[in-house]
Amino acid sequence: MGQKVHPIGMRVGIIRDWDAKWYAEKEYADYLHEDLAIRNFIKKELADASTSTIEIERAVNKVIVSIHTAKPGMVIGKAGSNVDALRAQLNKLTGKQVHINIIEIKQPDLDAHLVGESIARQLEQRVAFRRAQKQAIQRAMRAGAKGIKTQVSGRLNGADIARAEGYSEGTVPLHTLRADIDYAWEEALTTYGKLGVKVWIYRGEVLPARKNTKGGK
């Protein structure tokens, strides 16, 4: 069977940057576990705030966390109360000084994490899986996507045998490295077990910046 490489990992260093921006040698394992703890904690604390990518940068005894969210007001809170509480909890969790940047997602319908999360939450509320996918596709195309593909897998409608069913519209060129494709995978916890939700969104081409070489044309 043909297997598909992770669309984001394949494009790192070409048109996408790393979500973790730090370098370490002996401390690598410790930093990696700390990153996982930070991401899991933020996802749990901000479960209703439509958070997507979490970027982590490191300096000496300082951690800079950039949270991409569609609801910045909910994350910041009244007079910054929520973000201050979150910063204090992360300081305690890591034992380091944590700085938090809040970045607003202008078009949540073009973010694969948020689209996948929306489909998963609808499936948990017993919305038909075909309807949830088709509505998400329509919203993404109206928001300006060049193409979108979704897939839901598991015991669909409580069937005894698990299967996968997906829909797509437009083009999703997975082999084109300059194609800006956002990908995400989410889970829905239903009475019949877990359902997996995959989303690919093609947002257009990104041409990597040309490097100036001495004496080059």
Swiss-Prot record:
A GO molecular-function annotation: mRNA binding
Keyword Ribonucleoprotein: yes
SUPFAM superfamilies: Prokaryotic type KH domain (KH-domain type II), Ribosomal protein S3 C-terminal domain
Entries under InterPro entries matching the protein: KH_dom, KH_dom-like_a/b, KH_dom_type_2, KH_sf_prok-type, Ribosomal_S3_C_sf, Ribosomal_uS3_bac-typ, Ribosomal_uS3_C, Ribosomal_uS3_CS
Pfam annotation, one family: Ribosomal_S3_C
All residue ranges annotated as the KH type-2 domain in the record: 38-106
SMART domains the UniProt entry points to: KH
CDD domains: KH-II_30S_S3 (cd02412)
Keyword 4Fe-4S tagged: no
One GO BP: translation
GO CC, alphabetical: cytosolic small ribosomal subunit
Keywords: Ribonucleoprotein, Ribosomal protein, RNA-binding, rRNA-binding
PANTHER family: 30S/40S RIBOSOMAL PROTEIN S3 (PTHR11760), SMALL RIBOSOMAL SUBUNIT PROTEIN US3C (PTHR11760:SF19)
Its biological purpose: Binds the lower part of the 30S subunit head. Binds mRNA in the 70S ribosome, positioning it for translation.
Subunit structure: Part of the 30S ribosomal subunit. Forms a tight complex with proteins S10 and S14.
Family statement: Belongs to the universal ribosomal protein uS3 family.
Protein name: Small ribosomal subunit protein uS3
Organism for this UniProt entry: Streptococcus suis (strain 05ZYH33)
Lineage: Bacteria, Bacillati, Bacillota, Bacilli, Lactobacillales
